[in-house]
């Protein structure tokens, strides 16, 4: 599971979800990738679940890159607690994903296997996404 080793502040404000991604919008490591079409908070559990779905489908071949990291804590107050008395305790770690961001990349397998593996991973994520291919003749 992806969790930061240490953070400067234990509790943070919720990150904004508006706007387009400015960096990480192209497939740079692998041959195929998953590109977000809608904004979302992706938790560390969802990232891990998508990674497992991909690696199980491609079996031993291929390599997977994870291009997002859950570096923001999301807090929650306990159930049946009255309002007030401060902010809740950190419950999850999230990555703030904006439209256009490439989340995962994959290489080393044929196109049919790669598309199916990425399709399985998209179903584990809380956003709409598409499968993109690397640009250029490499």
Swiss-Prot record:
<keyword id="KW-0687">Ribonucleoprotein</keyword>
<feature type="compositionally biased region" description="Basic residues">
    <location>
        <begin position="1"/>
        <end position="16"/>
    </location>
</feature>
<dbReference type="InterPro" id="IPR047873">
    <property type="entry name" value="Ribosomal_uL16"/>
</dbReference>
<dbReference type="GO" id="GO:0000049">
    <property type="term" value="F:tRNA binding"/>
</dbReference>
<dbReference type="InterPro" id="IPR000114">
    <property type="entry name" value="Ribosomal_uL16_bact-type"/>
</dbReference>
<keyword id="KW-0689">Ribosomal protein</keyword>
<comment type="subunit">
    <text>Part of the 50S ribosomal subunit.</text>
</comment>
<dbReference type="InterPro" id="IPR016180">
    <property type="entry name" value="Ribosomal_uL16_dom"/>
</dbReference>
<comment type="similarity">
    <text>Belongs to the universal ribosomal protein uL16 family.</text>
</comment>
<keyword id="KW-0699">rRNA-binding</keyword>
<feature type="region of interest" description="Disordered">
    <location>
        <begin position="1"/>
        <end position="25"/>
    </location>
</feature>
<protein>
    <recommendedName>
        <fullName>Large ribosomal subunit protein uL16</fullName>
    </recommendedName>
</protein>
<dbReference type="GO" id="GO:0003735">
    <property type="term" value="F:structural constituent of ribosome"/>
</dbReference>
<keyword id="KW-0694">RNA-binding</keyword>
<dbReference type="GO" id="GO:0022625">
    <property type="term" value="C:cytosolic large ribosomal subunit"/>
</dbReference>
<dbReference type="GO" id="GO:0019843">
    <property type="term" value="F:rRNA binding"/>
</dbReference>
<keyword id="KW-0820">tRNA-binding</keyword>
<dbReference type="InterPro" id="IPR020798">
    <property type="entry name" value="Ribosomal_uL16_CS"/>
</dbReference>
<dbReference type="GO" id="GO:0006412">
    <property type="term" value="P:translation"/>
</dbReference>
<dbReference type="Pfam" id="PF00252">
    <property type="entry name" value="Ribosomal_L16"/>
</dbReference>
<dbReference type="InterPro" id="IPR036920">
    <property type="entry name" value="Ribosomal_uL16_sf"/>
</dbReference>
<comment type="function">
    <text>Binds 23S rRNA and is also seen to make contacts with the A and possibly P site tRNAs.</text>
</comment>
């Amino acid at each position: 599971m992806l969790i930061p080793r240490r953070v400067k502040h234990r509790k943070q404000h919720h990150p904004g979800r508006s706007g387009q991604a400015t960096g990480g919008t192209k497939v740079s490591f692998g041959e195929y990738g998953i590109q977000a079409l809608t904004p979302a908070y992706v938790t560390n559990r969802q990232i891990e679940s998508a990674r497992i779905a991909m690696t199980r489908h491609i079996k031993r071949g291929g390599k997977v890159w994870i291009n997002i990291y859950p570096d923001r804590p999301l807090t929650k107050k306990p159930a049946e607690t009255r309002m007030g008395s401060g902010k809740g305790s950190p419950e999850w770690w999230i990555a703030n994903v904006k439209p256009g961001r490439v989340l995962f990349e994959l290489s080393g397998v044929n196109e049919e296997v790669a598309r199916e593996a990425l399709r399985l991973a998209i179903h584990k994520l809380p956003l709409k996404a598409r499968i993109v291919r690397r640009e250029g003749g490499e």
